[in-house]
Each structure stands twice: as C-alpha cells, then as structure tokens.
C-alpha cells in the first residue's frame, strides 16, 4: 500500500469526535402520543432496520427487556453481532417467517430504514391492525410499505431510552415463542451448512461467525477491482 502525499485530500482523517452521530431529543408531544399507545400493547415487536453506522445496541436491548419484546435485527442494523448471549435478538427470521407465521403483533416499533427482508416487509404491510411507530431522524420518513406509522422523530438512543420508561409489558410467552422459532431455525441452518457435501460457499459465513472475535470488522468485496 502506498500512503498518499500529506497534502492530498485523501490523507486527512478527521478526529474521532467528528465521526459521532448527532443526537436529537424526542419531542415531548410525540413521545406522549406513542407512550399512550404503548401502554396498552401486549404483543410488542421491535424491528431494527438498516442504519448507517449501526443502531445503538444497549438502549434497544434495555427497551426490549423492559417491554418483553423480541428484536428482529436486519443484517445491516449492526445488532446481529456483539450482543450478549441470550439477548432477544432474532437473526434467522427470514428462513421461517413465511412458513411458520407467528401471531401478529399489536404494536410494531421500527428503528432505521425499511428491512431488507422481502418476507418481513410483506408481513409489515399485512399487519394492518397493529400500531406502527417509526423512529427516524428529524425530517426522515423511510417507510415504503404504506403502513402510515406514527413518526417519533429523534435519535434511536434517545427514543429507546424515553420509551423504556413507559409502563408496558407483553403477554406471557409472547417473546418466548418468537425466540424459540428463531433459535430452531438458526440451529437447522447451522447444521445444514456443516453437513458433509461438495464445496458449499455459504459455510464460510458460519465459520467466520464462530471464529471472529467480538467487535471484529470483516471487509468483503467482489473480484472486480482486482480484474480492473
């Protein structure tokens, strides 16, 4: 690798403080409206969608524990790795939601952009009886499914922290059913990827997940730059 000249624009690396994500508090009026809806929720579901830089794991996990809600984590949410063992984070739902649809939620709380999962987007559009809440930065409205959500404008961490103070609790067994289905699907996928067979490219992801240390960064790309 060749370092660029010191006066080249690409040689500048901003200090860490310049890379911090701006924090926006949640408007009190919007929070009061969402809190009143959340108090009556008995089947809450949290969707962690794609987000530049990843979503804040600790505030979302605290919120999930407080509400008794499962978190469906998109691959681009940043929540599929680095979370404690036993955290209510689901990562295999794309493999089972279509064939084993769960009881529909009555409250859907989505952070970030729309999920990349086609089946999850279809279900979101079909859960018309549920209350949909979209947490997005001020001025944002990343909602392609036509659910007409209540928008809670603010930073994900601020919104999760504020909602964790709402006295709400899911019905018994609600989160457990989601977790059991997802754990079973994950175990089946892992077992299938390790079965003796001809070369299976997908196995590399299973092995990397087990081998990489927490917080590791994996850089992946295609071969075009090499060929070019």
For the regions a protein language model found, what residue spans apply to each?
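Active-site donor-nucleotide binding/catalytic segment of nucleotide-sugar enzymes
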Residues: 37-53, 182, 190-199
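Thiamine diphosphate
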Residues: 116, 226-228
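Structural motif
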Residues: 43-45, 107, 217
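Active-site regions of enzymes building and remodeling cell-envelope glycoconjugates
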Residues: 13-17, 83-95, 130, 145-157
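Glycine-rich, anion-gripping cofactor-binding loops and their flanking helix/strand elements
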Residues: 32, 48-133, 141
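Glycine-rich phosphate/diphosphate-binding loops that line cofactor/substrate pockets in enzymes
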Residues: 31-44, 63, 207-214
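Phosphate/pyrophosphate-binding active-site segments
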Residues: 123-226
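Conformationally flexible catalytic loops at phosphate/diphosphate-handling active centers
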Residues: 1-39
């Amino acid at each position: 690798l060749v370092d660029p000249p010191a006066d080249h624009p690409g040689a500048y690396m901003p200090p860490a403080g310049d890379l911090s994500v701006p924090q926006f508090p949640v408007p009190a009026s919007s929070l009061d409206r969402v809190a009143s809806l959340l108090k009556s929720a008995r089947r809450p579901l949290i969707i962690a969608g794609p987000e530049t830089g990843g979503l804040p794991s600790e505030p979302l996990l605290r919120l999930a524990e407080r509400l008794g809600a499962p978190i469906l984590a998109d691959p681009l949410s940043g929540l599929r790795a680095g979370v404690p063992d036993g955290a209510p984070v689901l990562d295999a739902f794309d493999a089972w939601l279509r064939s084993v649809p769960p009881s529909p939620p009555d409250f859907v709380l989505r952070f970030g952009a729309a999920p990349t999962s086609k089946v999850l987007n279809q279900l979101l559009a079909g859960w018309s009886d549920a209350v949909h809440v979209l947490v997005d930065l001020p001025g944002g409205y990343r909602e392609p499914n036509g659910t007409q959500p209540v928008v809670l404008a603010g930073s994900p961490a601020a919104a999760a922290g504020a909602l964790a103070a709402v006295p709400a609790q899911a019905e018994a067994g609600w989160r457990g059913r989601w977790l059991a289905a997802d754990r079973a699907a994950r175990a089946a996928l892992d077992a299938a990827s390790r079965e003796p067979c001809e070369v299976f490219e997908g196995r590399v992801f299973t092995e990397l997940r087990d081998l990489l240390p927490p917080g590791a960064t994996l850089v992946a790309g295609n071969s075009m730059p090499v060929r070019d």
